[in-house]
Design a protein with these regions (language model features):
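Beta-propeller folds
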Residues: 1-219
């Protein structure tokens, strides 16, 4: 879809009642800004619904070198408090002054790397789609709250969540070990989605845990 006002539009999602919608927009279609995205919100209950930009590509809280990712599925919380979105590292611009025949590609093997080069190649498409979870609170406009980062990339917000706490699994400390031991291991954290604070609950776990919707109990 496209409109003269919002430019290229993608990833349209509605809330459960279909009273609101969010979508990605690429307002500047020039090559220099091809990786930049804004997020728009539309109140469909209005007499004449119109979309407004709530998450611009340079919003406060976005880490340096990162951008809004249209690979993540936008989702409005059931209570309408926040929007779940994804953030990714922006690709570095290619050096067009170097001819293709002079460019060299190398596989660098390091003993302490999270993934072997062969794993990176096999899972290339999955890694490229991977995003870091962030939240936009409607009562705190002009900023986003990063819940995930490079040290703890796996954060999932359950759709039935009613409280402010989620469980986070962090496998990063055990990725090198996984190269010879297939047993999945991770540290378990409790994460407050209102302020981003994390609390370590348990280390070196081999079984997954679930949290009650209100965030009071974990099993």
């Amino acid at each position: 879809y496209s409109t003269p006002k919002e430019g290229l539009i993608s990833g349209i999602k509605f809330n459960e009642e279909a009273t609101a919608a969010v979508f990605y927009s690429r307002r500047d279609t020039s090559e220099a800004t091809k990786d930049l995205r804004d997020i728009f919100y539309a109140d469909l209950t209005a007499e004449r619904p119109s979309a407004e930009c709530i998450v611009p590509s340079d919003i406060k809280g976005l880490p340096e070198g990162m951008g809004i990712s249209d690979k993540a599925t936008l989702r409005l919380s059931k209570d309408g408090r926040y929007l779940v979105l994804g953030v990714k590292e922006l690709p570095e611009p290619e050096d067009e002054t170097v001819p293709d025949f002079e460019k060299v590609s190398l596989d660098i093997w390091r003993w302490d790397a999270d993934y072997l080069p062969t794993q990176v190649k096999i899972n290339k498409s999955r890694f490229e789609r991977q995003t870091l979870t962030a939240l936009y609170y409607f009562d705190k406009p002009g900023q986003i709250l990063m819940l995930a980062d490079e040290t703890m990339p796996m954060v999932s917000i359950p759709e039935n969540l009613t409280g402010n706490t989620v469980l986070v699994l962090n496998d990063k400390p055990y990725r090198v070990e996984r190269q010879w031991d297939p047993t999945p291991r991770y540290d378990l954290y409790r994460l407050n989605i209102e302020n981003g604070e994390r609390e370590l609950i348990s280390r070196n776990r081999t079984v997954r845990s679930t949290l009650s919707p209100d965030g009071r109990y974990a099993a």
